[in-house]
């Protein structure tokens, strides 16, 4: 039924600026996204999502002090992705006879928590501790195209840059300079490695569900 409705709506949108037709296809695309999210959330690999271990060297400067060290993140799990939700309506446009839609997906309470064990070497310090990193602005942006036949194609998928990551590092106060150094390094790793790993899991899952015939 959804595909039939998309075919009818696309035919009108491709040739008309009538807001009624845009409203109809927006409604159908919204439903397709909601159904995809519901299906993805049933996967046992989504929440918690396991992220590969990561090791790195780092160097930071705080005032006149240089901090050089190494760290290893193990047993990394992302929690909260079962709370994904569509943010607002699909932004639907007809361009040269092609219907395109852009959407944002977030999570309830806007937090995805990463839990992991952290071992770091910094001077004479060689501790292992537990860390919880709260990603407080987890957002996925994706784009779709809908064919005349009502088929959906996902044309882009991006886990957006994290602008607000709050780290809770066991055994360290936020007033400790070492906390600031480690927090900065960990946040940089999230922006690069962790976002890529999340994309590897989420992008194929959304593509599979949205492009089902």
From Swiss-Prot:
Database matches in Gene3D superfamilies: 3.15.10.50
Residues spanning the signal sequence: 1-17
Subcellular location: Secreted
Pfam families: Grp7_allergen
Predominant location category: secreted
Glycosylation sites: 151
InterPro entries linked to this entry: Mite_allergen_7_sf (IPR038602), Mite_allergen_group-7 (IPR020234)
Keywords: Allergen, Glycoprotein, Secreted, Signal
GO CC annotation, single: extracellular region
Recorded family membership: Belongs to the mite group 7 allergen family.
Protein name: Mite allergen Der f 7
Originating organism: Dermatophagoides farinae
Gene (name only): DERF7
């Amino acid at each position: 039924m959804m595909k039939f409705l998309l075919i009818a709506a696309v035919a009108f949108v491709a040739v008309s600026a009538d807001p009624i037709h845009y409203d109809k296809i927006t409604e159908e695309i919204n439903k397709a996204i909601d159904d995809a999210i519901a299906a993805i959330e049933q996967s046992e690999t989504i929440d918690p999502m396991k992220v590969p271990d990561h090791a790195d060297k780092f160097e930071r400067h705080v005032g006149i002090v240089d901090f050089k060290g190494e760290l290893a993140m193990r047993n990394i799990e992302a929690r909260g992705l079962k709370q994904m939700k569509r943010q607002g309506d699909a932004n639907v446009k007809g361009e040269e006879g092609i219907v395109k839609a852009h959407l944002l997906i977030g999570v309830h309470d806007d937090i995805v928590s990463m839990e992991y064990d952290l071992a770091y070497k910094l001077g004479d310090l060689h501790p292992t501790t537990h860390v919880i990193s709260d990603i407080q602005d987890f957002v996925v942006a994706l784009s779709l195209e809908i064919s005349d036949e009502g088929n959906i194609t996902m044309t882009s998928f991006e886990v957006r840059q994290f602008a607000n990551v709050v780290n809770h590092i066991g055994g360290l106060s936020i007033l400790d300079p070492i906390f600031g150094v480690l927090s900065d390094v960990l946040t940089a790793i999230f922006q690069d490695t962790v976002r890529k790993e999340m994309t590897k899991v989420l992008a194929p899952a959304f593509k599979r569900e949205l492009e089902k015939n």
